[in-house]
Each structure stands twice: as C-alpha cells, then as structure tokens.
Amino acid sequence: MRKLFTIDLKDYNPNDYERPSITSDVLLFSVSDGVQTNYRKLKKKYFSVLLVKRDRYPFKDKWCIPGGFIGMEETCEETAKRVLATETNLHNIFMEQLYTFDDINRDPRTRVISVVNMALVDKNKLDDTLYPKASWFNVT
C-alpha cells in the first residue's frame, strides 16, 4: 500500500506558533433538602454550587470554581481529579465534560482556554471532608 502523506518533523518548529495555557475546571452541583417547617408540605429543595477561595493573584480572595492548569503529562480528566483532590479534598467524583471557554481576553495573565467538567453530588455526604477554603453556595 502506498503512503498518501509523509510527515517530516525536522522542518517543524513548535516555537513558530503561540500556545495558550489550558485549564481544567470543575462545576460541582448539589441538590439538598431544606428544613421542613410544615409536615403538610414537601421540603424545600436547594440547588448549590461548590466554590473555592483563591489564594493567588489575579482575583486573590475571590470565590471561583475549582480549577488548575493542565500539565504536559496530564489529560483534562486527570487534571480535574487532581484539582478536586487538592483544592476541596474530594475524590472519586464522576464528571462529564460540559463546555470549553475560550474568550480571548478572559484572563489578565495570558491566553487561557478552560475545559469545564460538571458533576452532581450529595453535599450532605461530602461536607465533613471539605477543606476550609471550599464552600457551598445556594444558587437562586
């Protein structure tokens, strides 16, 4: 069989192209019951998102979704798992890739593309294991 294409990598220089930074972020949601005040009514449900307080600039001390830069030897999924473990102390969470955010000037440091994963968890089973800089916020 004849080859249609040949690749000659000696002429390829990766430094000829600008490269963006890529992050993997995780949107963790939970639905939980409120306090039942009337036995004749169903408990109120609360929809929450997990945020972490940033400890670095830019946006130091602001709340954000957990995320981090993808290492050269990591996949997006591996990075998401690492980020959840290091920033929230959560492990073995099933995630699905949700969306890729690629606005050009969304990060003041450099060009950043973010691959966002999503998960739905039972926060009542996780609250005791969370790190102090991670907190649930009700979505209204």
Where are the regions that the model predicts?
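Nudix hydrolase/Nudix homology domain
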Residues: 1-4, 12, 60-63, 126-140
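Active-site segment of metal-dependent pyrophosphate-handling enzymes
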Residues: 44, 77-81, 85-140
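Active-site donor-binding loop signature of nucleotide-sugar glycosyltransferases
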Residues: 54, 67, 139
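Glycine-/small-residue-rich active-site loops that bind phosphorylated ligands and cofactors
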Residues: 57, 71-72, 105
